[in-house]
Each structure stands twice: as structure tokens, then as C-alpha cells.
Amino acid sequence: MMPFRTQPDALVPNYNLSVQDVYTDTARILMTSHGTLSLLSHVEDPSHRRIPNLPSWVPDYSVVQDPYALQYRGPCYWKASGNLTWSPNILTMANGELEVTGYHLDTIDKTSTLQTELEDPSAFWATIVKLASTLELPYPDPGNSNETPGRIELLWRTLTTNTYNRTYPAPSEIGSLFIDYILNLQIRHRLTPWSSSDEFQPHHSPLSESVYPDWRTLFRLEPPESPYSWDRYRKRLAMVVESMFDGTYSPIGLAQLQHEFDQGSGSRRRLFKTKGGYIGTGARSLGKGDEVWILHGGSVPFILRPQHDGYHSLIGESFVYGVMHGEVQSLSLPRRQVTIL
């Protein structure tokens, strides 16, 4: 591992140093030897940190990393900052301050809940559907890709970090798989079994509308020609129900999609929307008012939280649909110097 392969004395044991100093020195040496900000993707969620008074940009090596960094989702080769490089300030890093250069892409204004924060699994999806329904179209296209994804496509591609079975970008046919996934969710949520001690309830509806995902509204927002239109969804629903009665339907193909959701979102990462209409997924602890930054030398966007006197703290890495390959350079955003504590 760099730099220890070529510089075996890069870290010298010093038992007079505190744990915080040892971790900070390790992070500084790893980052300066690589010349990138890739180590920031290995910083765990703030809620999982055990070592107190550790700079927010320094990983807490005493905890297990969960989730793994986005780079392990597959051979994605994200390069959010394009060819822009990071110039380290070794002196300030030794004092716990990380100086970076970058672009404030946008500010988070809406977030979803996590599976672990709600008792009812349908309520988890209700917050996701509600967030997706607020997306304005056309979606921002800083890379001039001329693509015009609808809200449902934006949703599933973001929840999976646009990756399926280690393939990036995810094949378009995964959209059809997502439709079947939604159908299975609705059947499971609406037909939740009642207690065996209860009598038959022909109009049993265990969920209040406030926690039930409003998929119908989301589908009806799609144009008629969309593969995710309301009419196509209803036809697929009829086909699935018929195949269930025939005994020919098997949802086993949804297992891989569930795995992608578990890794890209679920209980591990929180879905968010920005004021400017971007959708993304990031650290559990992100919240309204946090900022999305593209930093020189960073392969993915990062979530920073403004602190006192213009400083920032690192919340974690993120996936933001549409800005993962250097598109930020075409936005004419002001380049800023930021210090992360």
C-alpha cells in the first residue's frame, strides 16, 4: 500500500501521541501520497464515530465501515471533478484542518427517512415517493447529454447509484424490473395479513394514507409515451396478478435489485433533493441545509455542513445523478477555497 511500499518510514511509532494524532497523521500521509481526496469516501457516518475530537475528514479506524465506499459498487470510474487536482497543504493538515478547492453545487432541501427510522416499511417508501414527486422537469443536464429522464427513472437510477450487478450505467431494462418491484411492494403493503385471532375483514386496510406510498400520483406524472406511464403500469399489474393466479409468476429476479437498493440506499444511505432540483443519495446523517460540493481531486460529490466562521465539516460522500463525470465544469460556478475541520 502506498506510501509504505516505497517509504517504510512514512509512519514511525510514537507512543506519546494521542489516538486522534495517530489517526490524523495516517490520513494525512495516505492522502498526500495518493494526491487525491479518495480517502474522504472512507470516512464513516458521523453517527458511527467513536473517537471524540477527531477531525471530520479523518476516518475513525476503530469502527467497521458500513456502508462501503461508493467506489466498491462496481467499475464505475466516477470522476465528478473531471481532471481537476487537489494541492495538499501538509502544515494545516497536521493541525487537523483540510484545505480544499471546489464548487458548491447546491444545497439540500428535502430528505427521505431510512428503513431503520420507521416501524412500518411502507412509510419508508412513502417518504421516497413524496420526494421524487417534487422533482421538477426537465432534470438539470449540465453535461448536455440531451437525456430527458422522468421522475421514476431518476428515482431508480439514484437508489441504485445507477449500478446493477456491477454494471454502470444500469441497463434501461432494469426500469421494467423496478415496475415489478413496485407491484410487489404494493401487494405486500396493501394485503398485510391481519392477526389470526381477527375475523375476516373484506375491506381490511392496515395502513393509513399518510404512510402509504402514493405511487399512483408518481406514475400519473409521467407522460403517456413514457415506459413508466400510468396506463402501462396498470397493464403490467393485470399481467402480474393473472400470472399469480396461474402459478407462473416468480419474483426471484427481484433479488438482485433488492441488493442494489440495500447497498445504494435503504438503511445505509439517505435519499435527498436539492433546491436546484438534483436528486442524490448520501450519508445517513445528512440533512436539510447541508451542501453538495464537487471538490478538486474528488471522484464523487461530498456533503459538507457549514460551521462557524466559514468553516465546514464533512458529512460524507454522495451520489448525485447527472454530475458524476466532471459536468460541474460546464456550470460556471465560482471556485471556492474551503477549510474542513
Regions from the PLM with identified roles:
Residues M2-L341:
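Acidic/Ser/Thr/Pro-rich low-complexity tail/linker regions in eukaryotic proteins
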